């Protein structure tokens, strides 16, 4: 079993890492950090390089969790990528970070986050910075 953590280098991504590592440790399973840049997106903004991926794996070790970083590209539907990873790695949950929003913003959840919450094949844990 694994816990999948959807990660982009941002405060929301760091919140997802913290919550995901805590869940993986509590369940005594490994963590799979999925950094999935959109095909054609500005990769320097969202894609981790090898040293950043190694730093995340070290952060997991310090949290008492075994982790691996995967970087599958996706076209338009991130949830399909996460569901495929969840199936391939026997995931028990997906963890994502959400931006804090105003009252109106809460009504209109981010489109990727909403898709993940509605279409995920496994339970989703959300967290904020």
Residue ranges and their predicted role:
Residues 1, 92, 121:
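Conserved acidic residues
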Residues 1-52, 59-68:
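Small/aliphatic-rich secondary-structure junction motif
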Residues 27, 63, 112, 119-121:
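Short, structured coil segments at secondary-structure junctions
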Residues 35-36, 93, 97-99, 128-129:
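Short secondary-structure boundary segments
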Residues 48-53, 84, 108-113:
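Charged helix-capping and loop-helix junction motifs
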Residues 62-94:
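Structural beta-alpha unit
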Residues 96-119:
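Glycine-rich, Arg-bearing micro-motifs that act as flexible, cationic patches
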Residues 115-129:
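Short, acidic/small-residue loops that bind anionic groups at enzyme active sites
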């Amino acid at each position: 079993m694994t816990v999948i953590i959807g990660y982009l280098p941002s405060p929301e991504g760091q919140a997802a890492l913290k919550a995901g590592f805590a869940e993986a440790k509590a369940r005594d399973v490994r963590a799979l950090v999925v950094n999935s840049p959109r095909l054609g997106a500005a990769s320097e903004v969202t894609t981790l390089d090898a040293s950043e991926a190694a730093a995340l794996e070290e952060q997991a070790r310090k949290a008492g969790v075994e982790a691996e970083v995967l970087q599958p590209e996706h076209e338009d539907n991130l949830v399909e990528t996460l569901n495929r990873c969840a199936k391939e790695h026997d995931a028990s949950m997906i963890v994502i970070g959400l931006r804090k929003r105003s009252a109106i913003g809460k009504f209109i959840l981010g489109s990727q986050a909403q898709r993940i919450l509605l279409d995920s094949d496994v339970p989703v844990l959300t967290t904020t910075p």
